[in-house]
């Protein structure tokens, strides 16, 4: 009853707003990691986030009868938690703003793992591999999916990244370690497995850690403080140079 009331409130709110107001609202966007064919962690409070215009209601409805509503902040960012059931699917999730609706289809609930590391984790099944042809040909596991973060510092390529279902074509670009881990786990516990591949050869773990966190760690806080100081000095020097130009 509570979920139904939330839904009715959202619908009534939508009809009360004028079409001219709707046209001024920014498009509803989801973080790229949320796409068709994704896997969400079972029996958890899972965060879903994205952006729209500031101070706008965002309604999320999952087909396992979970409905929640939130509001974007002053910058248009929003983040909401939904409760997931035990493993299963496929399900769908609707994300609704005043202007847009995004439908996520073929969503599975299971176990989600992060595959992070350097070149060993990055190594693809399309690279040299023992029994490569046989492994690729037999890689048709509908309940194994992988999301691969592209090697791109601009943040642009990830906008087009999607979850991929394991099959003899998609698996060629999967992390080999990530795939074989997922395959073994899926065979052993018989639940959907999602792998988020964030590997990049030669990178240090600090590069994958937020500045906020690095400032709190004994091993890195002094280094970050020096970087902050250098950045401030560079900014001050730029202001002086601009003033003298």
Predicted ranges, named:
Residues 1-25:
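Bacterial Sec-dependent N-terminal signal peptides
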Residues 21-245:
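Cell-envelope and extracellular/periplasmic
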């Amino acid at each position: 009853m509570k979920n139904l009331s939330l839904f009715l409130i959202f619908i009534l709110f939508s009809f009360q707003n004028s079409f001219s107001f709707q046209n001024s609202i920014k498009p509803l966007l989801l973080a790229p990691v949320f796409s068709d064919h994704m896997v969400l962690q079972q029996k958890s409070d899972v965060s879903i986030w994205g952006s729209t215009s500031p101070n706008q209601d965002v309604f999320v409805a999952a087909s396992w009868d979970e409905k929640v509503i939130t509001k974007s902040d002053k910058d248009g960012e929003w983040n909401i938690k939904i409760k997931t059931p035990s493993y299963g699917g496929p399900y769908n999730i609707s994300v609704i703003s005043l202007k847009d609706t995004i439908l996520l289809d073929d969503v599975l609930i299971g176990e989600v793992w992060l595959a992070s590391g350097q070149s060993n984790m990055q190594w693809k099944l399309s690279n040299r591999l023992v029994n490569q042809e046989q492994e690729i040909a037999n890689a048709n596991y509908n309940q194994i999916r992988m999301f691969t973060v592209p090697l791109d510092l601009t943040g642009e390529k990830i906008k087009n990244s999607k979850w991929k279902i394991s099959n003899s074509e998609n698996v060629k670009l999967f992390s080999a370690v990530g795939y074989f881990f997922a395959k073994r786990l899926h065979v052993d516990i018989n639940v959907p497995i999602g792998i988020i591949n964030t590997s990049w050869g030669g990178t240090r773990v600090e590069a994958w850690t937020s500045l906020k966190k690095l400032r709190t760690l004994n091993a890195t806080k002094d280094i970050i403080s020096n970087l902050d100081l250098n950045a401030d000095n560079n900014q001050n020097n730029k202001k002086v140079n601009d003033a003298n130009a």
